[in-house]
């Protein structure tokens, strides 16, 4: 099977989000897809049907939708905050992940897909891009707490970099300079083909690699090491996934990151950079299962632990 292209993601079918929130701070709204079934654990095909009468469509108010959702069957919910990639460039927005979020919902995973300022947008770079991510995930956490759901932060490529940055403490320019300890407690952080060392990655000449310079100079000029998760410590449980045939973010970068940190790494054999994002591809099915299994290893939703 040939590697999946970015254009394949744009052409894949999807459902519109169940919720389009009000814009935050004048930025674009969050898009939310509610799970249409209950999440399953590994080795089980059980899918508890949701109360379809409680599924919101064309809803503008998140508060109203949360109220409507209270009549759903009492099942443990997983909420995935999906951070899209695209080389931190304004040329690539979140729309290519609408099919993935639709698929997640069909597999029992609710998802929120925020947007953030990217190079070419006013206010991008440090700190704008990063505070947008911090704010988006804080909103997702508040929603997860309200619903008693498990929260997974998931990012792909440049979005994987931002997810891991959010989960890294002690960097020169890290999220823990912008919030308190509780802000960074999630059930899990998962990064697919993440860019983990900007200094090393930016030495290449690929179309995504050259965007490192744009990212570190778009706002306040920062040292790439100061926003590279490789040089920080983790707040919450973390898993990285490498695509063995990835020409954009080589698998050895992801594997090296996990090895240095003695963290978890899964290598998906025989796939490229975008394969796991396309519904219908076996790697996409594996990704959804990984997210479900990861948060089922311990017992309680975020915020409920002692």
For each of these PLM feature ranges, what is it?
Residues 234, 240-242, 246:
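Short beta-strand/loop motif that positions the catalytic acidic residue
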Residues 198, 245-249:
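Acidic catalytic loop of the alpha/beta-hydrolase fold
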């Amino acid at each position: 099977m040939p590697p999946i292209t970015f254009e394949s993601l744009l052409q894949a079918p999807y459902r519109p989000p169940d919720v389009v929130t009000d814009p935050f701070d004048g930025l674009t709204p969050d898009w939310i897809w509610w799970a249409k079934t209950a999440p399953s654990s590994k080795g089980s095909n059980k899918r508890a049907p949701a109360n379809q009468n409680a599924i919101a469509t064309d809803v503008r108010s998140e508060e109203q939708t949360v109220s409507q959702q209270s009549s759903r069957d009492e099942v443990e919910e997983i909420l995935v905050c999906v951070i899209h990639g695209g080389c931190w460039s304004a040329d690539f927005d979140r729309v290519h992940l609408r099919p993935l979020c639709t698929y997640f919902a069909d597999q029992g995973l609710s998802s929120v897909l925020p947007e953030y300022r990217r190079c070419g947008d006013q206010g991008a770079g440090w700190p704008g891009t990063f505070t947008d991510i911090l704010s988006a995930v804080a909103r997702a956490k508040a929603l997860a707490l309200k619903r008693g759901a498990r929260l997974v932060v998931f990012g792909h490529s440049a979005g994987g970099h931002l997810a891991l940055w959010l989960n890294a403490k002690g960097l020169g320019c890290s999220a823990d300079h912008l919030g308190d300890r509780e802000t960074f407690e999630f059930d899990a952080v998962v990064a697919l083909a993440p860019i983990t060392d900007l200094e090393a990655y930016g030495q290449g000449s690929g179309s995504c690699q050259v965007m490192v310079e744009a990212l570190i100079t778009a706002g306040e000029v920062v040292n790439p090491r100061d926003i590279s998760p490789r040089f920080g410590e983790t707040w919450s449980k973390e898993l990285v996934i490498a695509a063995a045939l990835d020409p954009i973010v080589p698998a050895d970068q992801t594997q090296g990151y996990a090895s240095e940190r003695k963290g978890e790494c899964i290598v998906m054999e025989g796939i490229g950079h975008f394969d796991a994002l396309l519904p219908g591809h076996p790697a996409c099915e594996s990704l959804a299962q990984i997210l479900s299994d990861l948060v089922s290893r311990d017992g309680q939703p975020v915020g409920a632990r002692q």
